[in-house]
C-alpha cells in the first residue's frame, strides 16, 4: 500500500486539501473525502459521462483522472453551479424544459453543457447534440436536454 499523498486544489471556489492514495480517482476523492456526492459514478470507464466535472475550466471524466492529477487545479462540480442559493441558468433551463427524469446523468450533462457554452456560446441544435453526445441518458430522449441548453445559451448570451 502506498503512502497517502498530500493534495491541494480549489473545488467550487474553495481551497481544499487532503491526503489520498496515489491511485485514488478524482471522483472518489470528491465523493468520499470531500462529501461532494453530486458527481456520479456510472460506468467507471469514462464512457457514460455521469462523472464529468470541470478541471481548470474544461470537461473531464473524474473516473479516469487520479485525484493527484488535480493537485493545484480548479475543479467545478455540480454543487458549485448555484450561487447564493440561486440556480445557474443551465439548472433553471433544465427545470423549465423538463430535461431530467431520474437525474443520474444530470450533473455530467450540466457540466458538459457548461463547457460547450464556454467554447461555443451560440450553438446550433446540431452542435448541442454533438456536444452532449459524450454523456449518456437513458430516460429523456435528449429533446428536453437540447431545448434546455439552447434556452440557457440565449439567456447566458444576453448582455448583463
Task: Show the residue positions of the predicted features.
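Signature of N-terminal electron-transfer/Fe-S-associated modules in redox systems
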Residues: 1-160
Amino acid at each position: 500500500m502506498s503512502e497517502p499523498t498530500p493534495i491541494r486544489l480549489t473545488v467550487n471556489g474553495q481551497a481544499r486539501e487532503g491526503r489520498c492514495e496515489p491511485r485514488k480517482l478524482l471522483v472518489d476523492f470528491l465523493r468520499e473525502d470531500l462529501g461532494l456526492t453530486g458527481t456520479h459514478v456510472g460506468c467507471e470507464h469514462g464512457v457514460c459521462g455521469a462523472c464529468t466535472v470541470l478541471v481548470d475550466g474544461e470537461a473531464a471524466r473524474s473516473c479516469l483522472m487520479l485525484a493527484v492529477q488535480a493537485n493545484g487545479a480548479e475543479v467545478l462540480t455540480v454543487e458549485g453551479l448555484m450561487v447564493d442559493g440561486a440556480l445557474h441558468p443551465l439548472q433553471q433551463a433544465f427545470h423549465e424544459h423538463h430535461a431530467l427524469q431520474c437525474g443520474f446523468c444530470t450533473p455530467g450533462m450540466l457540466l458538459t453543457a457548461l463547457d460547450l457554452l464556454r467554447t461555443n456560446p451560440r450553438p446550433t441544435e446540431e452542435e448541442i447534440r454533438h456536444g452532449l453526445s459524450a454523456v449518456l441518458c437513458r430516460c429523456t430522449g435528449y429533446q428536453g436536454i437540447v431545448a434546455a441548453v439552447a434556452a440557457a445559451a440565449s439567456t447566458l448570451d444576453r448582455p448583463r
